[in-house]
Amino acid sequence: MALSNDFWLFTRPIAHRGLWGGEIIENSLTAYKAAMDNGYPIEIDLFLTRDNEIVCFHDDNLYRMTGKDSKIYHNTLATLKSLPLKGTAERIPTLQEVLSLIDGKVPLLIEIKDQPNDFIVDKTVEILKNYGGEFAVQSFNPFYINRVKRLAPDFVCGILGTHEKERLSLPPFVKNIIFENFIPEK
């Protein structure tokens, strides 16, 4: 899929982890609703729990946001739901809760975080195939994006990267596609 210059990914500010600050906690349903209410597309980060549920959370360790020093993917959804975010009433939302809240009102930029269980890719694709809103999928893991494209060729996808030096050590198939998906046509 070729993306035009006026595609939302290139023309609109994107609320990273929702619209948060002050009393509003990042990656919370309140932050996502604030972004939606202000018309911003939203970037969300996905992790798979120990019991194979997808949650929206940025860090792989829970400590910064909950005070519990544990990898998010070592915990069940029930355990995660018992942990308040930064001492508030907010809890870590599931992907399904976020999709139900947003309901296609604003686009979503969905990052699949690198983690030990790559089943997250298949489960994310399965869920997104039934979502009616606009979205794009991204990851630092090129194998995740390759899998997404095999399962859902029509999904808009992109590979995240950090430094030119790292690009030199990428597998050849990644070097061939690294800049194609998120660059608009001239």
Task: Show which residues each predicted segment covers.
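Phosphate-group recognition and catalysis centered on beta-loop-alpha active-site segments
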Residues: 1-186
